[in-house]
Amino acid sequence: MQRFFRENRTRIISALVIFVLLIVCFANAGDGEIEEAITDSKRYKSTTEWMQEIDDDTSISAISIPGTHDSAAVHIFPGFALKTQSMSIADQLTNGFRYLDIRLAVESDKDGDYLGFVHSVGKCRVKGSIFSSQMRLDGVLDQIYAFLKAHPSETVLFCVKDENSKDDSREFEQLLFKSINQNRNSWYLYDSIPKLSSVRGKIVLLRRFNDSLNYGNVGLDFTWKDQGSKESVDLPYVMSSLNGTDKLWVQDRYRYTVGQKKDVFLDMLRNVAPDDNTFTLNFLSTAGDGSIGNPKGNAEILNDILLTTDLASQTAYGTIVVDFGTRQIAQHIYMSNFANADE
């Protein structure tokens, strides 16, 4: 035995080092939440029911809505590059977020195929252990249904992307609607921007996948052009048609530096106004321009910029999407829908 260890000492030490690094990297995917300041709750609408006081006749596009990017990437390896949130999806809803960025892929186990949560090459897991099971679509939907049942004044925007380009698009759509059809009355699946009255207590499907099965009612078409270039451009956001009438403006420069991202984010806040027929998505999230992404380090800077940016009262800024969302960030965004207490 001693001879074996002597002869293989280098290999054994290397294997142990790699194993420890794997454990450390994955453990980092579940801790280190960005601290949020204590806020005066009397100044804010309830995080669980802030939509309650918005008029029924308001289009969901004409509301300032807090959202999270890669919403399920809480427990994921490697955490440094792929972790984008510190709160579970259930906690995000409780803390005021209403737009969820859902990345799914077709997965398999002994019981068959299912849709599991992923971020790029990483699988989003239920708990902060490398041995924890992968998050599944049905489990997260149950959490959302429970939230909406408890808070029927609210709606959840559910933006679904098939993250794996190798997936069979027909199977992906079939699995997705197998889950949706189990509780179809809780969904808004049409291709027109709805009024809030039509979607209270429901999930609004936003589609970033092909309707390969020609189901027809498969939600609003949110298949915007990829914005992964690192180069600065004169027009940093892109417009597409939702249904021939309504428009979608998106700023998602996810490979920009923090400085570039700050500029394009604020530029869109100033220059692209959402309204009844114009939906806007303004991503504050970025992996950065390095070979390895650093979402958390970038979010610590960019989220502070958002919190120190004055948002006018009774003004719609559309949907603002962040990494490492906190209650304070959600409140800062959604309170722009209302008059200031001092006004």
Spans of model-derived segments:
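Loop/turn elements at helix/coil->beta-strand transitions in domains of secreted/extracellular proteins
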Residues: 95-100, 151-157, 200-202, 275-277, ...
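Aromatic-lined carbohydrate-binding surfaces of glycoside hydrolases
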Residues: 97-110, 162-165
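Long, acidic (Asp/Glu-rich), low-complexity accessory segments flanking structured domains
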Residues: 24-95, 108-146, 150, 213, ...
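Hydrophobic faces of well-ordered beta-strands that scaffold small-molecule active sites
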Residues: 61-63, 100-102, 156-158, 205-207, ...
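Catalytic cores of phosphodiester-bond-cleaving enzymes
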Residues: 129-183
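Surface-exposed substrate-engagement region within the catalytic domains
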Residues: 181-314
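N-terminal Sec-pathway targeting helices
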Residues: 2-16
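Hydrophobic membrane-insertion alpha-helices, especially the h-region
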Residues: 13-26
